[in-house]
């Protein structure tokens, strides 16, 4: 796994959920550019924030790293 995988996975799961980066950022309690900063490589979430992101995206941390979770997108 690498940072690009994490960034792409957040994007793929967010799209699957049908929410914008802006909406996801605000619903997680951050500035409107929070998710955009993560997926563009300007920042990474802390472990605690990663767990919140997984919860928001309705996936377990294990499923987050499982390629079959978003198969068919």
What do the PLM-derived regions correspond to, one by one?
Residues 1-16:
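A short, Lys/Arg-rich alpha-helix, primarily the initiator
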Residues 24-25, 53:
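Short alpha-helical "recognition helix" segments of helix-turn-helix
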Residues 42-55:
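Short, basic-rich loop-to-helix N-cap that marks the start of a DNA-contacting helix
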């Amino acid at each position: 796994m690498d940072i690009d995988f994490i960034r792409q996975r957040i994007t793929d799961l967010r799209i699957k959920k049908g929410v914008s980066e802006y909406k996801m950022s605000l619903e997680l309690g951050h500035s409107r550019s929070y998710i955009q900063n993560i997926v563009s490589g300007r920042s990474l979430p802390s472990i605690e924030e990663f767990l919140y992101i997984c919860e928001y995206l309705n996936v377990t941390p294990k499923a987050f790293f499982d390629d079959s979770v978003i198969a068919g997108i």
